[in-house]
Amino acid sequence: MKQGNVSLRAPEPEDLEVMLSFENDAALWELGMATGPYSRYQMKRYIAESQNDLYADGQLRLMIVCEKQRVAGIVDVFSFDARHNRAEVGIVVRKDLRGQGVAQAALSLLESHCFSLLGLRQLYAYVPVGNVASRKLFTSAGYTERGILKDWIRVGTSYQDVCFFQKINEL
């Protein structure tokens, strides 16, 4: 999957360090469901055992690659619901590459794959209200903000609202 200088590919054993750097970034934990760091052993097993098949694994994690095959980030499809043909999207891009269209291209590639090949009906994302960059990303990618969920994520000792974004495959 490629668009311009951005492509998506399955994780490789050589991606271990960069995957650990993203997955073990405590600043990102509050945006997801992680409750602690992954060990090298856990991540090695994930890379080795994942079939990188949404239907087999219940998730699809892809490496975002640009600039001479350098890993720029990770994009995930998870919380897959086969009955209702929908899944949640998550994306993280290296800080030095943010604001350069990398996330937009990666999201476009992922959507094309999910809608055209996998036949999903919809993708959705929960974005903290204060994460203006991510809200702009999903809006510009054609997602519709459907509402705000109050006190949806815990950050430290308080709770924050999130925006619920949805994109429907109009077959």
What does each model-found stretch correspond to?
Residues E49-S50, H113:
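A generic secondary-structure signal
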Residues T35-G36, Q59, E67, R154:
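Sparse recognition of residues in long alpha-helices and their boundaries
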Residues S50-M63:
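A short helix-loop-beta-strand connector motif used in the catalytic cores of GNAT acetyltransferases and
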Residues D15-V18, Q42:
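An acidic, carboxylate-rich microenvironment
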Residues S21-F22:
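Conserved catalytic core of Hanks-type protein kinase domains
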Residues A27-E49:
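Conserved GNAT-fold acetyl-CoA-binding loop/helix
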Residues E30-G32, Q59, V162:
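Short, hydrophobic secondary-structure boundary micro-motifs
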Residues M1-L16, D25, C66-L171:
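Acyl-donor (CoA/ACP) binding surface of acyl/acetyltransferases
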